[in-house]
Amino acid sequence: MLHRSSPRSFLPTALLLFALTGCAAPTAPASEPSRDTHGDIDGAAELAEPALGLTSIDGDGRVSHLDLLDETTADLGTVRAPVATHSDGRYLFSADDAGVSIVDSGVWTWDHVDHFHYYRAEARILGDVAGEGVATVATSNSSTTGGTGLFFPGSGEAVLLDTEALSKGEIAETFRLTVDPGPGLVVPAGSFAAVAAGDEVTLHAADGTRVGDPTACPSPAGTITTRVGAVIGCQDSALLIAVEDEQPVVERIPYPAGSTAPRATAFANREGRPTVAGVAEGAGVWLLDTRERTWTLLPTAQPVLQAVAVDDRDANVLVLTADGSVRVLDGETGAERAASVPLVAASLAAGLPVNLVADQQRAYLNGPAEDRLWEIDFADGARVAREFAPERSPLFFAETGR
């Protein structure tokens, strides 16, 4: 049974989130399987609006879910103490040196390109996937179809999970391959997956069978999936992997000629949108437009720690700067539009994990040292719309239901 309580909120409950999901694109996602279930799963209830929430894990592995509509909190159980987490907007993948624990928040959105479907099911902890070393996790834009990739650096094991099985409460590996230990990625792309390790990327069918020839990718790091395809960051470029005529296609997007700015090693966006952001350490923010196949460098006056491309009509780009502030940049010029007060200075000083996420209307930020979660209206002067003081310190969190 879920135990619900109300967190302390520092603004009136009338300031509730009215978040809308992203704008429709004219074509279907290139990297998703063709089978269309509208995200429906047996036992799930379809909703009239997204059931948005903040699902968090504290330092002891206790999992909580804050409902952003009624501000109640549910205790979802306990996983092993996390070292890192990843989320696709439904599941949280909590990694430590022994494997990955999977939490199903029970809320998700199905993007049908020209409209959306919203669902709620039972929230639960699904179990663990064993592996050596803190895994990197890669997901697609679907929480009910396709695959989820895990790469364990200690053993060099590349694992692809069946995401449809996850949506039914089961953990099923469709392949587990072994390459050289070290950094790596397993990136789902439709019914295929890319394994990035060493200095190359290989493509595989869902059963692990190699497909085609390897593609060079020096020092692979960072991945994200947009409506256009799956992105893998390389030292000199990004690889864009899409599925055309039921076959994977790899396209290289090189950094601009003559650029001396550091490459991006992580990417973030409003889920599914074609433009993604990455930090060019010490230089600013890289924007990668996967639809236009272009990079743009936005120089910044403040050192940037994280960057998120909202990719909305106003081309908003959100950054977390070294002073703990959230700043709103013009994605076309790099000009600063607004800035919050420093919110997470204590967490940054303590070396604690802080994460900035965004949807179409709001941004969210955790402060483990401050014991706070913030909702920020980035279109209204980076105003703090709501501030929550959860009972458990939010060491890691994700916005779920989107």
What is each PLM-predicted segment?
Residues 24-27:
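Bacterial signal peptide processing site
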Residues 38-46, 78-91, 122-147, 176-191, ...:
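Repeated scaffold domains used in trafficking and secretory/extracellular systems
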Residues 46-58, 85, 89-102, 136-138, ...:
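Short beta-strand elements that form the blades of beta-propeller/WD-repeat-like
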